[in-house]
């Protein structure tokens, strides 16, 4: 005690003892008791600080663990930004320990004054009561500081009631307990009475000043390495003050951002994120001028802890309604599978907001994290995080074109036609002797044809065959050209996503441009097939622009140097006649969502039509092997039956799409020597990656080149030709057979070219996952194995027909599912563990794995379309987190594939239910023909 008194004397408290005069011993005893009380209070205060500091350190460790778990569980909001784009967003001043020091130093100074005043006021009170009340208050502060967040509200209320009852022995103790508190902690006792003026501020309590608990919306701004320092600074500045003093300083210490955010009624989209405020901060915060209005009425009110701490929770119903509102603003009003499938993609065409939002609306709900400006002035990329590292197949369309659609289409076709004429008239394409090797070694020419669609070439050819219908149907066909001008072709007013492969003819989800199907489709079907967008093939056809006779003679010259003379005429005949059906049927056939379920053997009527054409074609090719006029005659004969049976052709061409979808191109030489030439040149071409043959073999798509296949097929029924030629004629018609053997030949004509166009999709994609045909290897084997066999054409085609009948069903059966709710029996399990994944075609422009049990289960647990879309997009964000462990990435990927299978099958079921399916005929015509475009995979419009 002597030592303690010396310490007190050093502090200057001995002046009080000397002033008392030493005569009164009772006063000395009272002063000593006060010193004891104050000293024990200081010791307790220091002990409390040390305990809290220890707790803070352990809490910091726990917070680090929670932070790591949060990264795994919810993904980082940083993933709204493209992960490959490196920049930092610092839109708010970080909550640093320096700012907390300044604010708390002010409260420290003021509370020191208050403490001295309280000591003077209560010096004459009963010291026992003072000690009891003060200890009670300290205990209350300790409990609130350390353990409030560890208990539920009922436990806290019971403890506080007990403490309040124990402190009720003295009125002064109650006054002390009511008026004194920690600066950073809100006492939540039920006997606290406040005005409504203070009520609003109490609800908007300064969360950042809480001692040990940083609010969730402040976490990103308190760096983890500085968090312990923040706690230490706060502990050093803990003081006991009165509520009145705190109320006076509310405006200085309060977090106005939190207050204004809570005052805002807002919607779900507008509510500040508890994960990261930097992406949800808006500049249109209400001014602070209306804050005094909250406290104009003076009414005593008891405040419960639940009132202060309650933050309005958002129900699933509210989220669904909010997402519905957003979708309505975006024009996605329907809740069917078509809308969902169209809107699942996070990339694609982001249309101009003024088209469906009138441009002037700046409503809260139209601001999203994905297209919002940060305070740094940097815009988060619209494309979000759907980027491929190696094969970047996504491209945002340009939106600047305001030309009418027809004008854009016509101008584009003129440009492309001029380009075609230039490339067609180039002498290199004629001077090179072999048909197969013509221009094959020109690397740039190969990639030029990648940038063109078969519809570009068919446009050119059609212009000279049927000039009256030149633009009528081409508007349907050319809007998805993969050339550099193609980005102008899609309308910005549509909400469809467009997946464009930058320099290849690839699959894309395209929007429907035209609602009409013009009658020129018939002439297109007969005249637009031969070129298929290949510049080296077009070069042989390019002379049609000047003279059709010259074109035939040039082609005959090339064929003379390769093979026998009669094959020359065959090539000439069919190169023109088979121009008919390529582009139209190929583009129609690309909608995989419908074709995957369509019947395989429903194409006999169109074959029957072709039977009428075949005899004339064959006879002309046999009797006039070298006459240049043969193509024109054949072409006219081909046109007439198609014109007479236009409606039937429409229906059957739609039905043929599935049958041709899984077929691959066959390598073809016009004779055995050509086959050897191909084999020799394949190695060179593989190295150069510049020839069609090498590309098709590389991509597991061993189909024949269309024109070469055309050369031999007409003559095959009447004479013996090369075995590869014969086998190709049978192989190229995989899925479709008619009871009439004579239909085999025209079917091979009509089917092959469309297969060619579809093949360019998977062939140029650079990804073997698109090779979804199970019979690809068999086709390749057939081509090479049949080279060694010599027999008559009719016999070989019959054998090939039987073979193909066995092979063709297997490929489409991989993806054929009944138009009903799926069951576990529909799930096809692999034959053995770790078997190669089999992919099916889909409506999304990329293949999907086979359905799994997850897809079947999801049928019974469907959410709203907007909720499902949000979940899928959030899954994209999670999956793009580079720090996520592989197992979680696999689980996410499996879920997303299962969900896409669900949407794909639901889309198919809806189309069957409404009659909008390919084999239902004309009901699908209006929906599908207007989407015609080479290299596109279509999802129907709303």
Swiss-Prot record:
Keywords assigned by UniProt, alphabetized: Phosphoprotein
Compositionally biased intervals (Acidic residues): 123-134
Entry keyword annotation includes Cell membrane: no
Biased composition (Polar residues): 15-28, 807-816
Compositionally biased tracts (Basic and acidic residues): 99-122
Protein's GO biological process: establishment of cell polarity; positive regulation of G2/M transition of mitotic cell cycle; rDNA heterochromatin formation; regulation of protein localization
Bias (Basic residues): 682-704
Gene Ontology cellular component annotations, sorted alphabetically: cellular bud neck; cellular bud tip; cytoplasm
Biased composition (Low complexity): 483-497, 518-541, 617-627
Modified residues (Phosphoserine): 50
Transmembrane segments: none
Residues covered by region (Disordered): 1-28, 91-142, 483-541, 617-654, 682-728, 788-817
Further information: 'ZDS' means 'zillion different screens' as both ZDS1 and ZDS2 have been found by a wide variety of genetic screens. Present with 105 molecules/cell in log phase SD medium.
PANTHER family for this protein: PROTEIN ZDS1-RELATED
Oligomer status and interactors: Interacts with SKG6.
Stated role: Acts as a negative regulator of polarized growth via an alternative mechanism to ZDS1. In heat-stressed cells appears to play a role in localizing BCY1 to the cytoplasm. Seems to interact with, and down-regulate, CDC42. Also acts as a suppressor of PKC1. May act as an integration point for distinct signaling pathways helping to maintain a balance among these different pathways.
Family stated for the protein in its record: To yeast ZDS1/NRC1/CES1.
Protein name stated in the entry: Protein ZDS2
Annotated source species: Saccharomyces cerevisiae (strain ATCC 204508 / S288c) (Baker's yeast)
């Amino acid at each position: 005690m002597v030592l303690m008194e010396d310490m007190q004397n050093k502090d200057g408290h001995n002046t009080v003892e000397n002033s008392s005069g030493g005569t009164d011993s009772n006063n000395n005893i009272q002063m000593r008791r006060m010193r004891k009380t104050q000293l024990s209070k200081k010791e307790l205060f220091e002990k409390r600080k040390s305990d809290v500091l220890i707790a803070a350190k352990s809490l910091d460790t726990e917070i680090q663990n929670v932070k790591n778990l949060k990264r795994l569980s919810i993904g980082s909001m940083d993933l709204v930004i493209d992960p490959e784009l490196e920049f930092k967003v610092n839109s708010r001043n970080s909550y640093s320990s320096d700012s907390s020091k300044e604010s708390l130093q002010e409260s420290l100074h003021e509370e020191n004054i208050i403490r001295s005043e309280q000591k003077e006021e209560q010096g004459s009170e009963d010291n026992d009561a003072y000690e009891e009340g003060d200890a009670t208050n300290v205990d209350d502060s300790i409990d609130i500081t350390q353990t409030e967040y560890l208990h539920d509200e009922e436990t806290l209320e019971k403890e506080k009631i007990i403490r309040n009852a124990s402190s009720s022995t003295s009125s002064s103790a109650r006054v002390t307990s009511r008026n004194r508190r920690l600066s950073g902690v809100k006492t939540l006792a039920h006997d606290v009475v406040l005005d409504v003026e203070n009520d609003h501020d109490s609800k908007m309590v300064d969360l950042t000043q809480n001692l040990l608990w940083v609010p969730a919306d402040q976490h990103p701004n308190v760096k983890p390495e500085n968090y312990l320092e923040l706690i230490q600074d706060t502990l050093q500045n803990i003081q006991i003050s009165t509520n009145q003093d705190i109320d006076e300083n509310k405006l200085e210490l309060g977090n106005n951002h939190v207050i204004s955010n809570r005052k805002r009624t807002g919607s779900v989209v507008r509510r500040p994120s508890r994960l990261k405020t930097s992406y949800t901060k808006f500049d249109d915060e209400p001014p602070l001028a209306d804050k005094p209005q909250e406290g104009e009425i003076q009414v005593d009110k008891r405040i419960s802890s639940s009132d202060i701490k309650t933050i309005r929770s958002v129900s699933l119903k509210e989220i669904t309604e909010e997402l519905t509102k957003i979708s309505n603003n975006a024009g996605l009003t329907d809740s069917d599978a078509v809308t969902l499938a169209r809107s699942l993609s996070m990339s694609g065409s982001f249309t101009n907001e003024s088209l469906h939002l009138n441009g002037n609306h700046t409503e809260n709900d139209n601001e999203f994290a994905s297209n919002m400006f940060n305070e740094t002035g940097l815009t988060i990329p619209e494309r979000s995080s759907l980027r491929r590292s190696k094969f970047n197949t996504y491209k945002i369309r340009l939106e600047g074109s305001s030309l009418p659609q027809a004008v854009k289409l016509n101008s584009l076709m003129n440009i492309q036609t001029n380009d075609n004429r230039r490339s067609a008239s180039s002498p290199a394409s004629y001077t090179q002797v072999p048909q197969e090797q013509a221009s094959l070694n020109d690397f740039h020419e190969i990639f030029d044809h990648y940038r063109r669609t078969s519809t570009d070439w068919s446009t050119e050819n059609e212009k000279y065959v049927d000039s009256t219908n030149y633009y009528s149907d081409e508007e349907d066909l050319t809007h998805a050209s993969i050339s550099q001008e193609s980005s102008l072709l899609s309308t910005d007013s549509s909400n469809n996503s467009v997946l464009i492969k930058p320099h290849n003819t690839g699959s894309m989800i395209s929007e429907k441009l035209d609602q009409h199907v013009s009658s020129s489709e018939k002439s297109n079907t007969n005249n637009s097939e031969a070129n298929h967008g290949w510049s080296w093939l077009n070069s042989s056809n390019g002379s049609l622009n000047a003279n059709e006779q010259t074109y035939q003679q040039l082609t005959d010259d090339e064929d003379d140097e390769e093979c026998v003379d009669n094959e020359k005429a065959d090539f000439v005949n069919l190169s023109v006649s088979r121009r008919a059906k390529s582009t139209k049927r190929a583009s129609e056939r690309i909608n995989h969502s419908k074709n995957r379920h369509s019947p395989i053997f429903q194409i006999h009527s169109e074959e029957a039509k072709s039977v009428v054409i075949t005899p004339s074609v064959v006879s002309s090719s046999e009797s006039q092997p070298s006459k240049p006029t043969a193509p024109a005659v054949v072409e006219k004969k081909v046109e007439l039956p198609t014109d007479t049976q236009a409606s039937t052709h429409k229906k059957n061409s739609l039905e043929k799409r599935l049958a041709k979808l899984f077929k691959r191109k066959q390598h073809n030489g016009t004779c055995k020597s050509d086959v050897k030439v191909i084999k020799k040149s394949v190695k060179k071409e593989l190295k150069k990656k510049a020839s069609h043959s090498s590309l098709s073999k590389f991509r597991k798509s061993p189909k024949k080149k269309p024109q070469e296949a055309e050369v031999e097929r007409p003559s095959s029924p009447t004479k013996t030709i090369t075995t590869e030629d014969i086998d190709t004629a049978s192989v190229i018609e995989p899925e479709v057979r008619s009871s009439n053997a004579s239909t085999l030949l025209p079917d091979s004509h009509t089917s092959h070219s469309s297969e060619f166009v579809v093949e360019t999709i998977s062939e140029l994609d650079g990804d073997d996952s698109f090779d979804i045909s199970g019979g690809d290897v068999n086709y390749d084997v057939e081509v090479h194995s049949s080279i060694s066999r010599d027999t008559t054409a009719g016999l070989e085609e019959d054998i090939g027909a039987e073979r193909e009948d066995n092979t063709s069903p297997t490929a489409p059966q991989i993806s054929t599912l009944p138009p009903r709710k799926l069951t576990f029996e529909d799930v096809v399990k692999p034959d053995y563990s770790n078997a190669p994944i089999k992919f099916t075609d889909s409506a999304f422009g990329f293949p999907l794995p086979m359905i799994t049990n997850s897809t079947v289960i999801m049928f019974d647990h469907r959410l709203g379309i907007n909720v499902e879309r949000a979940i899928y997009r959030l899954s994209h964000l999670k999956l793009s987190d580079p720090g996520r462990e592989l197992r979680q990435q696999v689980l996410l990927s499996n879920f997303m594939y299962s969900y896409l299978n669900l949407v794909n099958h639901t889309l198919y079921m809806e189309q069957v239910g409404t009659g909008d399916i390919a084999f239902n005929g004309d009901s699908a015509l209006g929906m599908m023909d207007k989407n015609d475009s080479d290299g596109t995979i279509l999802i129907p419009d709303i």
